[in-house]
Each structure stands twice: as C-alpha cells, then as structure tokens.
C-alpha cells in the first residue's frame, strides 16, 4: 500500500503538529516551514504536503514570499518526478510566474523578474522530464549557469534525478542500448555507466550482442510482456429482458 499524500515518514513532529491544526494558516509559521525546506534540501527528503502548505501561506501573504525558498521547493519537486508534485507547487504561484502567462499584464511582469525567469526555467526542466526527453533535459540543465544556481542548494540533485530516470527506464525496457542510456543518465563514460547500473540498479551489462553493448533490465511487473485475454459471459436472461422490453407498450 502506498503512503498517503499528506504523510511523510521523515516529517518532524513539530511540522506534523502544525499541518494537523489551524496553525498551518498562521503566517507566523512561515519561517518554520522555510527552515524545513532547507532541511529537506540538505538531507535529500521531500515533503510535498508541507511544501504546499508553505506555498499556500505565500499565496495568502505575498509579502512573505522568499524567491529562493520557492525555487528550492520546485527544484526538489523535480527529484520526485513523475509525481504531480511539481505541477501542484507551480499551481500555487502567482499567475505572472506561469510558463504561459494568460494576459498582457502578466506577460509584462514576467519579462522583468529574475524570479519569474527562474520559475519558468525550472518548469522547462519539468516538461522535459515528464515527456521523457532525458537527453535534452541534461543538455538544457548544462546549458546555462542559472540552472546550476537554481539546483545548488539541493544536495545530490543530479544523482536523485538520475535514479528517477533509471526507475522509469526500468518500467519500460527489458533491454536498452548502452550509448542511449549514457545520454539519458548523463554518464560521460562507459565505466561510469557500468558502475551505476550495477551498483544502483542491479542491472546487467551485456557486451556480447551483435548490436553492441546493451543493458539488460530484470523482469518486473511493469516491463513484463503479458498476453491479456478478456472474456465476457452473457446469460440468456439478459437477452430475455431485452426481448420483453421490445414487446412492452409505451405508457
């Protein structure tokens, strides 16, 4: 059974108490949530429910908004894709920060704000991950120093994303070309790839195939090929009701 959306095994007791009561709407708890975001960035955890509560406080109290905290939340959300965490967080931000501003005023505001640029760059990364454009994700991430600044506070950002990509690959493939996987995981050498797939994924590297080196993924419930046969039983009594309906006179 999966963990409930509003639960987090690593959540401190004081944060849980705030989220369970009316204090979650108290602006004075903003600093507590902000410190908790810093903690998540440092210890590689992610508490979506608590982060959404902080973004909701920002929504009610725009003067309290800290741009760095918001971008850290979004960067952390990237490390748990393909969950809806990023889109949920993005939906609580001001309209002018959205990737596609809906009116002229929002578009004008978006052109003059470093914060808006940061949000939209992170949204671009999210789009690439969600659409499984992994090689383009890494090339985009490495294309601008601003991306490095936006993810600098998130400990192990690249490693966490790399693991999530591997999980998604494992759901869709039984076998994949090593060169392709190198690009998808942004591992610059064959040695690094072999070490990652062996130690992190427990996958096998096969160098004996006619098509070059391939990585073999063990069978799991997601990538297993299964033939599915569906059959439906239609009883005579079901036809009987249809026939009787045909002889009934309209009222």
Swiss-Prot record:
Gene3D superfamilies named in the record: ARM repeat, domain 1, Winged helix-like DNA-binding domain superfamily/Winged helix DNA-binding domain
Gene Ontology biological process: formation of cytoplasmic translation initiation complex; regulation of translational initiation
Top-level division of the source organism's lineage: Eukaryota
Stored Pfam families: CSN8_PSD8_EIF3K
PANTHER family reported in the protein's UniProt record: EUKARYOTIC TRANSLATION INITIATION FACTOR 3 SUBUNIT 11, EUKARYOTIC TRANSLATION INITIATION FACTOR 3 SUBUNIT K
Family per similarity comment: Belongs to the eIF-3 subunit K family.
Subunit organization: Component of the eukaryotic translation initiation factor 3 (eIF-3) complex.
Protein name listed in UniProt: Eukaryotic translation initiation factor 3 subunit K
């Amino acid at each position: 059974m999966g963990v409930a959306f509003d639960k987090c095994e690593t959540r401190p007791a004081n944060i849980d108490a705030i989220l369970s009561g009316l204090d979650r709407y108290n602006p004075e708890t903003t600093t507590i949530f902000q410190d908790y975001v810093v903690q998540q960035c440092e210890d590689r955890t992610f508490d979506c429910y608590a982060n959404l509560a902080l973004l909701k406080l920002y929504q009610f109290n725009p003067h309290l908004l800290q741009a760095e905290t918001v971008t850290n939340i979004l960067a952390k959300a990237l490390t748990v894709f393909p969950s809806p965490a990023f889109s949920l967080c993005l939906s609580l931000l001001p309209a002018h920060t959205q990737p596609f501003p809906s009116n002229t005023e929002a578009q004008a505001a978006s052109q003059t704000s470093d914060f808006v640029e940061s949000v939209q760059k992170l949204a671009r990364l999210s789009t690439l991950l969600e659409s499984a454009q992994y090689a383009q994700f890494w090339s985009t991430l490495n294309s601008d120093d601003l991306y490095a600044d936006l993810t600098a506070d998130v400990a192990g950002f690249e490693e966490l994303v790399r693991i999530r990509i591997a999980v998604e690959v494992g759901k869709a493939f039984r076998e994949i070309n090593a060169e392709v996987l190198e690009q998808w995981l942004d591992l610059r050498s064959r040695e690094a790839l072999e070490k990652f797939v062996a130690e992190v994924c427990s996958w096998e590297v096969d160098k004996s195939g006619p098509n070059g080196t391939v990585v073999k993924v063990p069978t799991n419930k997601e990538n297993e090929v299964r033939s599915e046969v569906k059959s439906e039983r239609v009883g005579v009594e079901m036809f009987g009701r249809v026939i009787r309906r045909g002889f009934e006179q309209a009222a």
